Amino acid sequence: MPELPEVETTLRGIAPHVTGRRVTAVTARAAKLRLPIPPELGERLTGRVIERVERRAKYLLLRCGDGTAIIHLGMTGTLRVAPAGSPPGKYDHLDLVLDDGRTLRFRDPRKFGLVLWTGSDPLAHPLLAQLGPEPFPPLFNGSYLFSRSRKRNAAIKLLLMDNRIVVGVGNIYANEALFRARIHPERAAGSLSEEDCATLATAVGDVLRDAIAEGDTTLHEFIATEVPSGYFRINPAVYGQTGKPCTVCGTPIARIRLGNRSTWFCPVCQK
């Protein structure tokens, strides 16, 4: 599933090619993804200029004057700018043809993504309104995490993955951030000190920024005719490293199930 760094890189990859471009035609080849594609989408978008592209959590927002297309990539979705005349593939469900002849193309083999339209503030849309802050300062920091974790017995890893607390911290990045902060994933969130929270908030931001920086090396792929694999080459310290030696102390990395998700940690370094 594309996580926040992949979505941010998608934004950076397509924005230079679509910003300021007018949509001249819309072709929807599927009536429904995770939710139905609005039947009026073509009418709403055709003739409008994409003024800017934004990201909120894992949603991409195509701002078009007084309306916005809201896009979520789901589990397997990608957005690419296809050359003029490039034929669609089997899983290419939506095309926005631009005034330079190229096409902003949404591909989604498993059809768990979504494309919606709103004529009001997209941040007030029910899908976005209850989301927590982005996982970076100034809104997400140690003080914020400390205040939101008080009197909570939930495991800190589960708190990090709660989009109402903070957005964009998927399983990979939660595991890696907790390792960097030396905090056990099962530890009760309410037991963290202010110093713990400050360290963890910094680790979350650092892990995600590192992944985004890796993604910046793939920006050329967003105008390729072939769809790349889409996931960045990361070198995780704990994620997926069951039994391998900890990079700090050499202890074998342990794996448990937490909240129905695989969780990895160092039994010695993380307390």
From Swiss-Prot:
EC number(s) given by UniProt: 3.2.2.23, 4.2.99.18
Catalytic activity: Hydrolysis of DNA containing ring-opened 7-methylguanine residues, releasing 2,6-diamino-4-hydroxy-5-(N-methyl)formamidopyrimidine; 2'-deoxyribonucleotide-(2'-deoxyribose 5'-phosphate)-2'-deoxyribonucleotide-DNA = a 3'-end 2'-deoxyribonucleotide-(2,3-dehydro-2,3-deoxyribose 5'-phosphate)-DNA + a 5'-end 5'-phospho-2'-deoxyribonucleoside-DNA + H(+)
Disulfide bonds: none
Molecular function terms from GO: 8-oxo-7,8-dihydroguanine DNA N-glycosylase activity; class I DNA-(apurinic or apyrimidinic site) endonuclease activity; damaged DNA binding; DNA-(apurinic or apyrimidinic site) endonuclease activity; zinc ion binding
Binding site for DNA: R110, R152
SMART domains in UniProt: Fapy_DNA_glyco, H2TH
One Pfam family hit: zf-FPG_IleRS
InterPro entries: DNA_glyclase/AP_lyase_DNA-bd, DNA_glyclase_Znf_dom_DNA_BS, Formamido-pyr_DNA_Glyclase, FPG_cat, MutM-like_N-ter, Ribosomal_uS13-like_H2TH, Znf_DNA_glyclase/AP_lyase, Znf_FPG/IleRS
UniProt record, GO biological process: base-excision repair
Entry keyword set: DNA damage, DNA repair, DNA-binding, Glycosidase, Hydrolase, Lyase, Metal-binding, Multifunctional enzyme, Zinc, Zinc-finger
CDD domains: EcFpg-like_N (cd08966)
Cofactor mode of binding and number, as noted: Binds 1 zinc ion per subunit.
Functional note: Involved in base excision repair of DNA damaged by oxidation or by mutagenic agents. Acts as a DNA glycosylase that recognizes and removes damaged bases. Has a preference for oxidized purines, such as 7,8-dihydro-8-oxoguanine (8-oxoG). Has AP (apurinic/apyrimidinic) lyase activity and introduces nicks in the DNA strand. Cleaves the DNA backbone by beta-delta elimination to generate a single-strand break at the site of the removed base with both 3'- and 5'-phosphates.
Protein name per the record: Formamidopyrimidine-DNA glycosylase
Record organism: Geobacter sulfurreducens (strain ATCC 51573 / DSM 12127 / PCA)
